[in-house]
Every structure is written in structure tokens, then in C-alpha cells.
UniProtKB/Swiss-Prot annotation:
Molecular function terms, GO-annotated: ATP binding; nicotinate-nucleotide adenylyltransferase activity
Coiled-coil blocks: none
Keywords associated with the record: ATP-binding, NAD, Nucleotide-binding, Nucleotidyltransferase, Pyridine nucleotide biosynthesis, Transferase
Record-linked InterPro entries: Cyt_trans-like, NadD/NMNAT, Rossmann-like_a/b/a_fold
Catalyses which reaction(s): nicotinate beta-D-ribonucleotide + ATP + H(+) = deamido-NAD(+) + diphosphate
One Pfam family recorded for the sequence: CTP_transf_like
Identification of the protein by name: Probable nicotinate-nucleotide adenylyltransferase
Annotated pathway: Cofactor biosynthesis; NAD(+) biosynthesis; deamido-NAD(+) from nicotinate D-ribonucleotide: step 1/1
Organism: Buchnera aphidicola subsp. Acyrthosiphon pisum (strain APS)
Top-level taxonomic group: Bacteria
SUPFAM superfamilies: Nucleotidylyl transferase
Length: 214
């Protein structure tokens, strides 16, 4: 059985234990051999923050140092460009064999508005979707719900047996840490050292990140 590679995209502003612990839990439960962290410089469905992409990347590198599970992709880091998942997956598939199983990790909150993503139905042509629990407001979209229902599987081993095309809902613990909360903590002078690796905390303090309201 082939082991999975997985892509975990996000703002990572900053990367924190919620990201890291979730990724390690998914890797253990579903036998993921490699998780590719995909920092977004300018995600289309979120407000842009003031943190530079170079600072985000540096914090990620510090957080995953000497952890062989992780690597970083720079495909969505070009300044002032808007990136779409479907385009990024096409580029990744040019580097990874179309026969190799690949997952794209997203939260249940993002799944609710998945129908707004560019060419959203085509994403399963390039990867599986691996969904992790996240608090969200239910948004009803009949077309999306039908699509999810028709492609969802309940045995994670099936993700290893074909390269793409399936949706799997993980039972990983819900993330109760948010990057926006951490940014606010720093802005108001509150301690966040328990929410992210100490080396990342030290970098934030050294560079005085998040000292202005974002």
C-alpha cells in the first residue's frame, strides 16, 4: 500500500501548535509519509495581514526544524499574486507522479464555502480532500452537499489505493487555537508562549511582529 503525501495550506500567521499537532495526528492516524506546508502570501478568501511572507516562512522553518515529516512549498509565496488551489495542485502534480496518492487538508469551516473556490469540482481530479474538525456555521448548498456525499469514504485506507478523487473526514481533535487570537495576544501584550513553539515566540518578540493592529 502506498503511503500518502498531504498538502496543508494556510496563512500560518503565525504557525502554532494547532497546526503542528493536527498535522502530526493526521500523519499518525492515516499513515501520511510527508506533509507539505503551503504558506499563502495572498489567499483569495481571507483578509491580507501585514506580516511579510519572508517572516511567515522563517517562523515555519523554525517550527519544523529537524522534523522529517514536514517540508515547505513556495508555490504560493510570490508577492501580490492571488493563488488558487486548483492551479497549485496542477503544478504539484507536475512534480509528483499522477499515480501517487495525494491529499489536500482543509478544515470543515472552509468546506462550507468550498463551492466558492475556483473550479472546485476539479480539485478531486488532482487530490483527495482530507477534512479536519473545525467550528463553523452551517451553510446549506445543495450542490456542494450532494458532491460531498457522493465522494465521501469512511475507510482511510482507501486514500492509499488511488491517487485522488475521495473525501475523508478525520476524527482528529478540533483545533482550539487560532492565529488571529495569537496576533491579538501579542498586540495587547498578552503571553502566547504556550500556543506556539518557544523558538517562534522568540522570533516574534525579536522582530516585534503583531505589535500593530492586524
Amino acid at each position: 500500500m502506498k503511503k500518502l503525501c498531504a498538502i496543508f495550506g494556510g496563512n500560518f500567521d503565525p504557525i502554532h501548535y494547532g497546526h503542528i499537532n493536527l498535522a502530526e495526528k493526521l500523519a499518525k492516524d492515516i499513515s501520511i509519509k510527508k506533509i507539505i506546508l503551503l504558506p499563502n502570501n495572498y489567499p483569495p478568501h481571507r483578509n491580507k495581514t501585514q506580516t511579510s511572507i519572508s517572516d511567515k516562512i522563517k517562523m515555519i522553518k523554525l517550527a519544523i526544524h529537524n522534523n522529517p515529516l514536514f517540508e515547505i512549498s513556495y508555490l504560493e509565496t510570490k508577492k501580490n499574486n492571488i493563488f488558487y488551489t486548483i492551479d497549485t495542485l496542477k503544478k504539484i502534480r507536475k512534480k509528483i507522479s499522477h499515480l501517487e496518492p495525494l491529499c489536500f487538508i482543509i478544515g470543515e469551516d472552509n468546506l462550507q464555502t468550498f463551492y466558492l473556490w475556483k473550479n472546485w469540482r476539479e480539485i478531486l481530479l488532482y487530490s483527495h480532500l482530507l477534512i479536519y474538525p473545525r467550528k463553523h456555521k452551517k451553510q446549506k448548498n445543495d450542490e456542494l452537499e450532494k458532491w460531498i456525499h457522493s465522494n465521501t469514504v469512511y475507510d482511510c485506507n482507501l486514500l492509499h489505493k488511488q491517487p485522488c478523487g475521495l473525501i475523508f473526514f478525520s476524527h482528529a481533535p478540533c483545533i482550539n487555537i487560532s492565529s488571529s487570537r495569537i496576533r491579538k495576544n501579542y498586540f495587547y501584550g498578552k503571553n502566547s508562549h504556550s500556543l506556539l513553539p518557544s523558538i517562534v515566540n522568540n522570533y516574534i518578540l525579536l522582530k516585534k511582529l503583531y505589535y500593530t493592529n492586524q
